[in-house]
Curated annotation (Swiss-Prot):
This is Recombination protein RecR. GO terms for biological process: DNA recombination; DNA repair. Residues 81-175 form the Toprim domain. Gene3D superfamilies: 3.30.60.80, 3.40.1360.10, 6.10.250.240, RecR Domain 1. The lineage of its organism: Bacteria, Bacillati, Bacillota, Clostridia, Eubacteriales. Belongs to the RecR family. GO terms for molecular function: DNA binding; zinc ion binding. Pfam families: RecR_C (PF21175), RecR_HhH (PF21176), RecR_ZnF (PF02132), Toprim_4 (PF13662). It comes from Clostridium perfringens (strain 13 / Type A). It comes from the Bacteria.
């Protein structure tokens, strides 16, 4: 893109690194930002820097937080005997929109994927097992219905079985190969209601 100054090309390149942002979208975002008033651009940049500097992972569940433990883990009104296992922090946001689940969460930060060289030791399964105490009665596995999500669900079921914890899987309704983030609230609610033992 030799017709753009180097600074614009660099900004387009950086935006294009974001998920679901192609070259055209990156170009549109860049041009939009360049047309904003300087104070709005500075506010945007400061918000990015502040979020990156203050947001961390909850030491209990692995969710994004600015306090430790996070607001969900430290909420006395949450059910402590049920944990919903998800792949990423964004999945907690999706589940919370449904307003059907009042337990705790556990974020794996990935799935088991031998093809990508990712085994159980590379995601937060050890931390999940460590959370199994006399209080936890059920673990709902809400990984995405992909090959990796299913493999991860089966592994979790196998590893928790000796610990006398009921392990369930969210029900059909989420399409195979789908992503929880894109499921509507009714579908996700029905999937939670119809979960099955694995």
């Amino acid at each position: 893109m030799e017709f753009y100054p180097v600074a614009i090309e660099k900004l387009i390149e950086e935006f294009a690194k974001l998920p679901s942002i192609g070259k055209k979208s990156a170009q549109r975002l860049t041009l939009h930002i360049l047309n904003l008033p300087k104070d709005e651009v500075e506010e945007f940049a400061n918000a990015l820097v502040k979020a990156r500097g203050t947001i961390k992972y909850c030491s209990v569940c692995g969710n994004f937080t600015d306090t430790d433990p996070c607001a969900i883990c430290s909420n006395p009104n949450r059910e402590k005997d049920i944990i919903c296992v998800v792949e990423q922090p964004k999945d907690i946001m999706t589940m919370e929109k449904v307003k059907e689940f009042n337990g705790l969460y556990h974020v794996l930060h990935g799935t088991i994927s031998p093809m990508q060289g990712r085994g159980p030791q590379d995601i937060r399964i050890r931390e999940l097992v460590a959370r199994m105490s006399g209080d936890v009665k059920e673990v709902i596995v809400a990984t995405n219905p992909t090959i990796e999500g299913e493999a991860t669900a089966m592994y979790i079921s196998k590893i928790l079985k000796p610990l006398d914890v009921k392990v369930t899987r969210i029900a059909a309704g989420i399409p195979v190969g789908g992503d929880l983030e894109y499921a509507d609230e009714v579908t996700l609610s029905k999937a939670l209601e119809g979960r099955t033992v694995i």
